[in-house]
Amino acid sequence: GCIATGSFCTLSKGCCTKNCGWNFACN
């Protein structure tokens, strides 16, 4: 799923830009 983060998600930060984009991260 995706959760709001308040900052841009990057793969290096363990996030999924492909699925979530701005202000969202995989959990």
Curated annotation (Swiss-Prot):
Cellular localisation: Secreted
Disulfide bonds: 2-16, 9-20, 15-26
One GO cellular component, as annotated: extracellular region
Main location: secreted
GO molecular function: sodium channel regulator activity; toxin activity
Site-annotated residues for Hydrophobic/aromatic residue important for potent activity: 8
Range of residues in the leader sequence: none
Keywords: Disulfide bond, Hydroxylation, Ion channel impairing toxin, Knottin, Neurotoxin, Secreted, Toxin, Voltage-gated sodium channel impairing toxin
Source organism superkingdom: Eukaryota
Tissue expression per record: Confined to the epidermis and to the mucus layer.
Keyword NADP: no
Family to which this protein belongs: Belongs to the nemertide family.
Free-text note on domains in this protein's UniProt record: The presence of a 'disulfide through disulfide knot' structurally defines this protein as a knottin.
Role this protein plays: Highly potent toxin against both insect and some mammalian sodium channels (Nav). It potently inhibits inactivation of insect sodium channels of B.germanica (BgNav1) and also delays the inactivation of mammalian Nav with potent activity on Nav1.3/SCN3A and Nav1.4/SCN4A. 1 uM is enough to completely inhibits the inactivation, resulting in sustained non-inactivating currents. In addition, the toxin significantly enhances the recovery from inactivation, and the open state is not required for the toxin to interact with the channel.
Other remarks on this protein: Negative results: does not show effect on rat Nav1.8/SCN10A.
Name of the molecule in the record: Nemertide alpha-8
